[in-house]
């Protein structure tokens, strides 16, 4: 195993920074809903990390989600779909360290066809998934029909 990526104790994520979006946001722990979906963060201006998965920077795919908008306007991941391959994502952790990731792909999928295996399956290196809603808003369900998923790999 590459020693640069050995997990640290108590390296829980506390803040995500995406310079290309001028984004700095706190990170809260998230659980799965009774339906088995990742719960959304409580606040439109905060992100959430799936606490049952890897901590950002550990082996495997860490997942951080955020809202695209709210009744009051744009939310924390409003511009997530504008990220390009090569953009940097910094995850500041409770132990004072920062895990740095480089984006390599962005996808949009219908929520009914969410790529669960590609998002949550084990990876060869520490990776990060950033997820928000996208596509058309369905007034009847009160939700967007798609998800935007950004894939990133740890570089430092």
Report each predicted region and the residues it spans.
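Solvent-exposed, non-transmembrane regions of membrane-associated and secreted proteins
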Residues: 1-84, 92-97, 104-156
